[in-house]
């Protein structure tokens, strides 16, 4: 099944700016986010929106889509084949059959090795108590990540030294490679493996980062946990990922939450559930019982004749929605508890109650010991 046009998915024109792409994505992702939209198909719609944004926000991927269409650069001029016909063929620097066409037809999807590139995104898993997730908190975390080298400030060269023309590619930034392929011997150009396309090399590499421009360190960060986060949800800390390349922006850090269950409540989204045991007299006669909520205790009125399974709803006594859409509710589920041990007087009263109710009770022992006693008494 062919993919939908990514511009159509986001509802934008093909000459849309990056800001217009981002605005359209934010609007649609908020509308179809699975945590907000429970309608059937919303999850797939959200994935489609995310995929469209991922492609159109990347200049190289967008250029490929604009040049070859949404099915990629496989179909050319009625040749009757595409890249999948050649299985795992990768005779052009590991790029596969599509890269052969890139060489023949102008290389529209090739990336400039000197172009600014965003750094890698990172992920951190944070464990929260139920209370921390409900009310929000601020926590300090320690993560190991690549940071800009303090010695060379990301340049890669030893301070006080300069760069020189790459001796491998003579400053071109790329080298010619000839390879035998199924189409014959083909000459292609590849990024210089020594200078990574810059055309320059160090007189002397930085002694701290050994020319990488980055060093791996433990970094402490303060993370503000918003009220109402749920298990598996995440927040993005912009610019806290790995450093960018060639002056590109740093990546982002995604903090994924693991929320411990509550000993008092069961959570379902923004709603919480509380199990309340009531005695037989309380259920039969009614009562007022003090129950816990997230912030304090309140009195709950139990009407006379309440049965097991009865549910009471306390509006807006649940969890604050993490996106700011009000509060959930607190549901109280009733369970009428049958007494397991009765005094003789209590038994008499229960029998009297049964008689008044027109019931004839054939009392049964509750365990082996009681049955044995009745046997030896001849009952």
From Swiss-Prot:
One Pfam family linked to the record: DnaJ_C
Binding site for Zn(2+) 1: 149, 152, 206, 209
Note on how the cofactor is bound: Binds 2 Zn(2+) ions per monomer.
InterPro entries per the UniProt record, alphabetical: DnaJ, DnaJ_C, DnaJ_domain, DnaJ_domain_CS, HSP40/DnaJ_pept-bd, HSP_DnaJ_Cys-rich_dom, HSP_DnaJ_Cys-rich_dom_sf, J_dom_sf
PANTHER family according to UniProt: CHAPERONE PROTEIN DNAJ (PTHR43096:SF48), DNAJ HOMOLOG 1, MITOCHONDRIAL-RELATED (PTHR43096)
The protein's role, per its UniProt record: Participates actively in the response to hyperosmotic and heat shock by preventing the aggregation of stress-denatured proteins and by disaggregating proteins, also in an autonomous, DnaK-independent fashion. Unfolded proteins bind initially to DnaJ; upon interaction with the DnaJ-bound protein, DnaK hydrolyzes its bound ATP, resulting in the formation of a stable complex. GrpE releases ADP from DnaK; ATP binding to DnaK triggers the release of the substrate protein, thus completing the reaction cycle.
The protein's name in its UniProt record: Chaperone protein DnaJ
Species this chain originates from: Staphylococcus aureus
Gene that this sequence comes from: dnaJ
């Amino acid at each position: 099944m062919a993919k939908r046009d990514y511009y159509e998915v986001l509802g934008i024109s093909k000459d849309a700016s990056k800001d217009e792409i981002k605005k359209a994505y934010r609007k649609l992702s908020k509308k179809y986010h699975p945590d907000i939209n429970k309608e059937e198909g919303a999850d797939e719609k959200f994935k489609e929106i995310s995929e469209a944004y991922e492609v159109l926000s990347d200049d190289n991927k967008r250029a490929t889509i604009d040049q070859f269409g949404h099915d990629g650069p496989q179909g050319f001029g009625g040749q009757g084949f595409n890249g999948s016909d050649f299985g795992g063929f990768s005779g052009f620097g590991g790029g596969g059959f599509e890269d052969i066409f890139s060489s023949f037809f102008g290389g529209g999807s090739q990336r400039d090795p000197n172009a600014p590139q965003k750094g890698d995104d990172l992920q951190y898993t944070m464990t929260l108590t139920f209370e921390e997730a409900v009310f929000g908190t601020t926590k300090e975390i320690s993560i190991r990540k690549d940071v800009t080298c303090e010695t060379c400030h990301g340049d890669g060269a030893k301070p006080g030294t300069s760069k020189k023309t790459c001796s491998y590619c003579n400053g071109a930034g790329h080298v010619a490679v000839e390879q035998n392929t199924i189409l014959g011997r083909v000459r292609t150009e590849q990024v210089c493996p020594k200078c990574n396309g810059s055309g320059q090399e160090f007189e002397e590499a930085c002694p701290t980062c050994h020319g990488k421009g980055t060093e791996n360190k433990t970094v402490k960060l303060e993370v503000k946990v918003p009220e109402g986060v749920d298990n598996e949800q995440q927040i993005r800390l912009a610019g806290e990922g790995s450093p960018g390349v060639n002056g590109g922006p740093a990546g982002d850090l995604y903090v994924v939450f693991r929320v411990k269950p509550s000993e008092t409540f069961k959570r379902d989204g923004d709603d919480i559930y509380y199990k309340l045991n009531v005695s037989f007299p309380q259920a039969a006669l009614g009562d007022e019982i003090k129950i816990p909520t997230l912030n304090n205790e309140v009195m709950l009125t139990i009407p006379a004749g309440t049965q097991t399974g009865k549910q009471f709803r306390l509006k807006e006594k649940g969890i604050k929605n993490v996106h700011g859409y009000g509060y959930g509710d607190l549901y109280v589920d009733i369970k009428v508890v049958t007494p397991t041990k009765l005094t003789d007087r209590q038994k008499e009263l229960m029998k009297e109650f049964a008689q008044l109710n027109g019931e004839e009770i054939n009392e049964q022992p509750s365990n082996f010991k009681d049955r044995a006693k009745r046997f030896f008494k001849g009952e």
